[in-house]
């Protein structure tokens, strides 16, 4: 009887839950004011910040021309993530990193991060009477690992009430097989005022 029940559940896909349970989230925070700062060499180069992350994986921030770049892990200048940002002015000087961890093996392996960015929208820019304040918010999913560190996808955090779930879905279903510089980045859910990055052939 148990075998028959198990077979029926397997046919219905109800035994796939343990696979999902083998992925968990770990959260860390950073604040550029408390991180090691290296000054930039030019006026529009604001420098870089090395911040603590998860275990031996660091959070590296870089900023210039009112835009930011973020990568994770051992610092590498050639990480594709260090050239990926949003078209509009943006910042992420502090925040909470959600690390997606694969626990199916002997050692837990972080394979993606999710981080909320602040982005200036066209309305922010047009209606500003002083320093521009950003009201746009987007979740950025970044892949980790030997295949490179790069953006996998984006979710407009204000246009989608389930933004966190959408971002986790991008991470869990795509990050581990995503080919940096080859695969198209994913935009999931509705898009409001935030201008999303575009791949060259789109």
Task: Annotate each PLM feature.
Residues 156-202:
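C-terminal partner/receptor-binding element of secreted or periplasmic proteins
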Residues 2-5, 15-87:
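Charge-rich, low-complexity N-terminal segments
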Residues 11-12:
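Sequence termini and other peripheral, non-core segments
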Residues 86-161, 165:
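Short helix/strand-capping turn motifs
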Residues 34-36, 50-52, 149-151, 173, ...:
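Sequence contexts marking disulfide-bonded cysteines in secreted/extracellular proteins
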Residues 8:
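Loop-to-helix "switch" segment enriched in basic
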């Amino acid at each position: 009887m148990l075998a028959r029940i198990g077979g029926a559940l397997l046919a219905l896909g109800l035994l796939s839950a343990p696979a999902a349970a083998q992925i968990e989230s770990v959260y860390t925070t950073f604040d550029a004011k408390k991180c090691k700062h290296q000054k930039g060499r030019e006026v529009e180069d604001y420098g870089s910040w090395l911040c603590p992350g998860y275990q031996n994986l660091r959070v590296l921030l870089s900023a210039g021309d009112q835009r930011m770049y973020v990568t994770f892990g051992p610092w590498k200048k050639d990480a594709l993530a260090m050239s990926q940002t949003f078209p509009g002015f943006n910042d992420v000087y502090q925040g909470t990193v959600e690390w997606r961890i694969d626990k199916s093996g002997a050692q837990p392996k972080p394979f993606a991060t999710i981080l909320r960015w602040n982005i200036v929208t066209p309305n922010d820019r047009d209606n500003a009477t002083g320093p521009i304040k950003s009201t746009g918010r987007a979740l950025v999913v970044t892949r980790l690992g030997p295949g490179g560190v790069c953006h996998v996808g984006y979710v407009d955090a204000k246009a989608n009430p389930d933004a966190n779930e959408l971002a986790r879905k991008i991470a869990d279903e795509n990050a581990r097989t995503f080919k940096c510089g080859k695969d198209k980045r994913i935009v999931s859910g509705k898009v409001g005022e935030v201008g999303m990055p575009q791949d060259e052939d789109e």
